[in-house]
Amino acid sequence: MGPTASGKTALALELAEKHNCEIISVDSALIYRGMDIGSAKPSADELARGPHRLIDIRDPSESYSAADFRADAIAEIEQIVSMGKTPVLVGGTMMYFKALLEGLSPLPSADEAIRAEIQAEADEKGWEALHDQLREIDPVSAERIHPNDPQRLSRALEVYRISGKSMTELTQTKSAPLPYDVVQFAIAPRERKVLHDLIAQRFAIMLKQGFLEEVTELKARGDLHLDLPSMRCVGYRQCWQYLDGEFDYDTMVEKAVAATRQLAKRQLTWLRSWPELNWLESGAEGNLVTLMRQCR
């Protein structure tokens, strides 16, 4: 694992080429078909060197939860192990890693009809009134969720209306943890400025590769919008807004790079609190040797 632009893919490919391993992607952007440039999806040459499982498995119009990922990843792990190989899980979506390793609470799946009901109530009464409802049924979640956070507020109310139990009650029970021994590594530059520079350089390369054209094609479909999880991925939202005329090109670049740096900051915050983590420095010689030594 590691922040965006830290060199995870390069190290994983080296590992897959030199050892009996197969790669499983742990990335909430790489799951989407047609989102190749802005997600930094491995190139055709890279995929030929080391095929990645769990990429291009959803249309951008579809949702994909941490629970979906956990089920899919466990199935892939079991298949790889049955082939006598070692699974290598690579990515930066920390919520997916956490769900896989620790298990998940048995929350109900989304119900579009109930979500529509909640949205209609919010349109009529305001989110503050719905927050009052949540405080009555789940004071713990109400304390944690701000009235100005409609996505999380709606989900907490939805869970209660589907199950008759509060999110707090349901999250006290988790599915079983992953039944495998896992050696965990994080890779990141030692200096923050190095990572910031890498992020800016990579976004410039994405634009040269046709990132704006990719977003233009996604917009032209007509069934996608900025409220979808796929279009909330960093870079895609800013390019979309630029194409809508919300700001100029230079501002788009500035906003996209800033959003990516914020993502990297959040990823590093997760990783610094992660237990049993072995750290590698991006670009350092001997990373593969260090990694293999720790795995023995």
UniProtKB/Swiss-Prot annotation:
Transmembrane segments: none annotated. Keywords: ATP-binding, Magnesium, Nucleotide-binding, Transferase, tRNA processing. Signal peptide: none annotated. The keyword Nucleotide-binding applies. The record marks 93, 115 as: Interaction with substrate tRNA. Pfam families: IPPT. ATP binds at residues 2-9. Gene3D superfamilies: 1.10.20.140, P-loop containing nucleotide triphosphate hydrolases. GO terms for molecular function: ATP binding; tRNA dimethylallyltransferase activity. Its cofactor is Mg(2+). Residues 27-30, 151-155, 232-237 are annotated as: Interaction with substrate tRNA. InterPro entries: Dimethylallyltransferase (IPR039657), IPT (IPR018022), P-loop_NTPase (IPR027417). Its EC number is 2.5.1.75. It is an enzyme of class 2 (transferase). It catalyses: adenosine(37) in tRNA + dimethylallyl diphosphate = N(6)-dimethylallyladenosine(37) in tRNA + diphosphate. Catalyzes the transfer of a dimethylallyl group onto the adenine at position 37 in tRNAs that read codons beginning with uridine, leading to the formation of N6-(dimethylallyl)adenosine (i(6)A). Belongs to the IPP transferase family. HAMAP family: IPP_trans. NCBIfam families: miaA. Monomer. This is tRNA dimethylallyltransferase. It comes from Shewanella baltica (strain OS195).
